[in-house]
Regions:
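Pan-zinc metallopeptidase signature
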Residues: 1-16, 172-253
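Auxiliary, metal-adjacent structural segments of Zn-dependent hydrolase domains
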Residues: 17-111
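Short glycine-rich, low-complexity/disordered patches
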Residues: 52-61, 132-133, 153-159, 241
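Active-site alpha-helix of zinc metalloproteases
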Residues: 100, 108-120, 125, 179, ...
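Post-HEXXH active-site segment of zinc metalloproteases
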Residues: 112-113, 124-164, 202-210
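Acidic/His metal-coordination segments adjacent to aromatic residues that form catalytic metal sites
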Residues: 166-172
Length: 253
């Protein structure tokens, strides 16, 4: 089974979750989508309105073919000689409504990876909304004055560095500040939503090879708690952020 994005949109049965998020699952033999409804419902109701008319489609395989993408239900290796490449997701942001497509087979046996991908992209779309999140922005300003602080991702760290350097030269930093706010909010919001759905371990959020300093744990929790106040968890969900994975005691080895 192969179909274009247009064919997928015409043939898929779209559902509206209780939080207002629109989604659909394109199923095929061997595709496990049992966790999708609860994952979608984890997006706080007060946040779902910020993603506008975004529609999320969960498909078996998502392949890049030339300049376009196709949806496949077959377990087949992408034909690289034909310009095919397996994709984890596709996000098309448009004013009239964004389209997010995520490959379930790409994240087969990796429910954590699937959740982080989904919530990160929802967080990014939400960060594009024009309304101000003053409480969160003020927190970022306070943390920016702390020279010890880091960020969740290199992108946010780079934008923050530009803001600090531009301000130090007495230059206007509005564009860099907007980009920093967006990057930092996307990072924290994605982790916050993921932590409503599954256990998130703070130490797993960073790559050992990254050159930028990681955010301090207490500053990370301040960001997450601020977002929790702005976007309370839906009924049946609660924040599950753990600082460190449990270690096996020597007596149990």
């Amino acid at each position: 089974m192969h179909m274009t994005v247009e064919e997928m949109l015409r043939s898929s049965e779209v559902q509206t979750a209780e939080n207002g998020l629109v989604y659909a699952v394109v199923e095929s033999e061997g595709t496990d989508a049992t966790a999708v409804p609860r994952m979608v419902e984890a997006v706080p109701r007060s946040l779902a309105g910020r993603v506008g008319r975004t529609a999320c489609y969960f498909v078996p395989w998502l392949l890049k073919e030339g300049r376009g993408i196709i949806i496949s239900g077959e377990d087949a290796t992408p034909a690289e000689e034909d310009g095919q490449k397996a994709l984890c997701h596709h996000l098309d942001v448009r004013p009239q409504g964004s389209l997010l497509i995520i490959s379930l087979k790409f994240y087969e046996n990796d429910g954590y990876g699937l959740a982080m991908e989904f919530f990160d992209k929802i967080a990014y779309v939400a960060s594009l909304a024009e309304e101000q999140r003053d409480d969160f922005y003020r927190l970022l300003e306070r943390q920016m004055r702390d020279e010890r602080s880091g960020e969740l991702t290199p992108e946010a760290a780079e934008w923050r560095r530009e803001v600090i350097e531009q301000r130090g030269r007495g230059e206007a930093a509005e564009e860099s500040l907007t980009n920093y706010h967006r990057a930092a909010e996307t990072d924290a919001l994605g982790v916050y939503m993921a932590a409503l759905f599954t256990d998130v371990f703070f130490e797993d959020l960073f790559d050992d090879e990254e050159s930028t300093p990681p955010i301090l744990p207490e500053q990370f929790y301040d960001r997450v708690r601020t977002l929790e106040r702005l976007y309370p968890a839906n009924r049946g969900y609660s924040l599950q952020v753990v600082r460190q994975r449990p270690r096996r005691s020597s007596s149990s080895r």
